[in-house]
């Protein structure tokens, strides 16, 4: 289908296709390909509102919920608001959801930690034994880690209850860190039949937004759960693997899905102008062949590629590019400076953002601390929320 020969409501059938997967008598799992600007969240909300209208009373009586996992608190809050905070929908970030699953199982968490700490210590001790200089920084750091992990292992007997804050830094002796919560949840889902029963009983439908960025080990666990419980459980993934931001997500998520999964596709991009969509399609042409369509009422727009040496002075280069774009587009807003500047810049990486925005001295020390690293990268570090 060409960029011109289509209607703006070409994806209208997708909502029905997704809704049909949530059949409680014959559940079906699915991966919804939804590229940039496709209206993914709108489809999610429309489908859930229709489900609520038809099955909400039944779910409330049976104390069941649909779990909707998002990547950020902002996305979670938006979906909750659009679903009118209805109790049959459990909307949370992946860390909050994982913690809800594992929190009651204190002894099982202890067993996992004992085993995991032992493996870590053995690995560190092996590396330490092969160190040529026990006084260099790497050796000193390893020695500190070995001591810390041994202390933690011994302290496990004194812990009555573990604590965890999905939006905090979790540094107390009885706390779990973000990575551990995800790994423990994945392990329990894959290996413990009781956990599998609890998940599908409470959440017979589990939907994951931005699934391409959900940690690989947890996605693999959900795949295993769906394989075992597919007669009573529907797993729905929303996403676009080309929009993957974090490297710990599952690569090529849409490849190798079971034959009995539904694979609906949203073709429209309601957000971008036509030239931009043409460029997007060209970029991904040899990757997965997915093509998006623009709205018929969108302008052509402009898409220009400037290739510069990494040795150039960035501020001068960007100023030059803005002036060039002002001439190309006949739009003076490109060339404005200071408070009148009206150009949006996409910064792809945390270190780059820190350098450009002038907070390197704040970012670097926190990034170097392993226990704070995850929080500073995903915005959950409690102290950073002050800013």
Region spans (language model):
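The feature marks helicase ATPase cores and/or their adjacent C-terminal helical subdomains
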Residues: 1-387
